[in-house]
Structure formats: structure tokens, C-alpha cells
Amino acid sequence: MNLWIYAKSSHRDSLENVRRGSTIANALAEFSPTLCTGDYRAASIAKETMDVKNSMGVDAMGNLPHTMQRLDMLVYDNEDVTPEMHQEMSEFCAKLYSVGKDLPFDIVDESYFKENKSHTKKGVFFSDDDYDKWFLNFCNGSKKHDAPLLNGNYFFLDTTKEYEKSFSEVTDEEEYKAFIKSSEYLLCGCVHTCLESLACGNKPVFFMRKDKLSSNVKLISKYKIPLAYGKNLDALMQDFEKVIANYPQTEKIQAYDFSSLKEEIVAVFKEYEGLVPAMDYSYSYANK
């Protein structure tokens, strides 16, 4: 029996699901879980920059039963799962957990809660993805601002020189955690990254991307994180400065307590100890 974690990902998606999945994998490290992601690059990123020990790319969540064994356990973070697929996976697994239902979305890795000192006044992070180059066009023609931009993992390679025209520097995506920790005021287009900044004791400012819907925006209101607006980068940065000058009191985010989940997992391992899954079990969802 093994523990698996699945996080939706692709080059068109942010890595918010993967960051939550990595947080869960690290918190449950004693069970040697494997983090599966929707694309192979995300699996590599999780291992190289999110401290995940075991990761692998899986084309689709529906293909997991071809890798897992019957009666394994699964935690998944995938908003695209249908009730039918959830039911199929529930029948396949000894225990099935869904992020957003069994676990909250505002799970932040414990490393962000450690004592931290900000070294940079301001920082900007849009997202890991910009497939349609919406943010690049948003920045086009702006003046150069006195703030660094953290590069996205899925940004096109040829965009760095363009961003250097708008920001004081472009920080490599491998420096993600250090950048988030060190930026006292972070202008950010990702909800989960705002929560990580908040956990550090820093002051995130959220801005809504216009190319697609952001996930879990309700958490911005829950933690009273301020928003900045602008029709282009210059207007956005001007509003960012106004927010900094009158930054409001935010709600404190707490580290999630995984103790109950760990107890459940231990109990399931003990319950199924020594059992061998039937070899004739047929899982057909992936082929439907």
C-alpha cells in the first residue's frame, strides 16, 4: 500500500495546485508519498525547488490507476474532477481525499512560517504561466520601475529581455522561495503565492489577471489582502504604491495541522496491512 498525491498542472496553468500538493507531500513525508503532476516539468520543479522527494509526471489523473495499486491512498488537488471520476477513484482507493473538500485550499508549506527578514522593499510576481503573453502585452511600453520581477516557470524564454525594460531586474524562477520570503511588499497575481507571502510576515498585494479566472479568490477577502488595479503596468504600479502607503491590517494565516490526517493514514495502513488486492479488479474510467 502506498500514498499518492495528484496535483493538476500544465504549461497553461499556474503552479498553485502543485505548490499545495508539495506542501502536503512534505507534511506527510513519513509515509514516503509520490507527488504526481499533470506534466513532467512540474514534477521536476517540485523536486528541485519545493523539496519534494518523490515526484513523477502523469498525463491525466484518469491514468493514475495504471501506476497505482488497488487499495492505495490518494490525495488529489484537481478542480476538473467530475463526480463520476471521484466515485471511480473512491472505489479503487482504500482512502481518497480531495483538496477543497477534505483539506482546505489555504495550506502553506511550513518553511514559509519560519522566522524571516525581508531584504527587498518591493517585488512583483505575476504567475508561473503566461501562455498567451497577456502579462507581457500588459507591460509593453511601460517605463522602467524600481522593482524586480520574479520570472514564471512557464514564461517563454524570449520574454526576459522585454521584461527587463519594465523592471529593475528579472529574477530566475529557481529563486521563487527566496524571492517571496525577501519581498516586504509583493504585488502578485496568484492567490496561493499571496498566502505564502502572508505566512512569511510580509505584505502581499493582489491584482486580478484578465486573461483567465483566478482560483480561490475568496481567500483574498478572507485574509483581507488588499488589491491593486490598473489598465496597464504603469497604472498598476502607481496603485501599488498607494496601497503600500496605506497598507491595511490583514488576517494572520495559520499553519495547517496535519495530525488528524496522519492518524487516519496510519489507521488505514494498519487496517489493510497484509492484504493483497485482487488481480482481476478492472478500472475502466481512463478508457471511457
Segment roles from a protein language model:
Residues 53-60, 168-172, 225-235:
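Short acidic-hydrophobic, aromatic-tinged amphipathic segments that line or gate anion-handling sites
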Residues 194-253:
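Catalytic binding pocket for nucleotide-activated donors in carbohydrate/polymer assembly enzymes
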Residues 160-200, 205, 209-213:
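Donor nucleotide-activated moiety binding/catalytic core segment of transferases
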Residues 5-11, 76, 95-157:
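Active-site donor-nucleotide binding/catalytic segment of nucleotide-sugar enzymes
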Residues 36-42, 48-49, 144-171:
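Catalytic donor nucleotide-activated moiety binding site of glycosyltransferases and closely related
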Residues 54-93:
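Extended catalytic core of nucleotide-activated donor transferases of GT-like folds
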Residues 255-288:
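C-terminal alpha-helical cap of glycosyltransferases
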Residues 1-54, 282-288:
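N-terminal pre-catalytic "stem/leader" segment of glycosyltransferase-like enzymes
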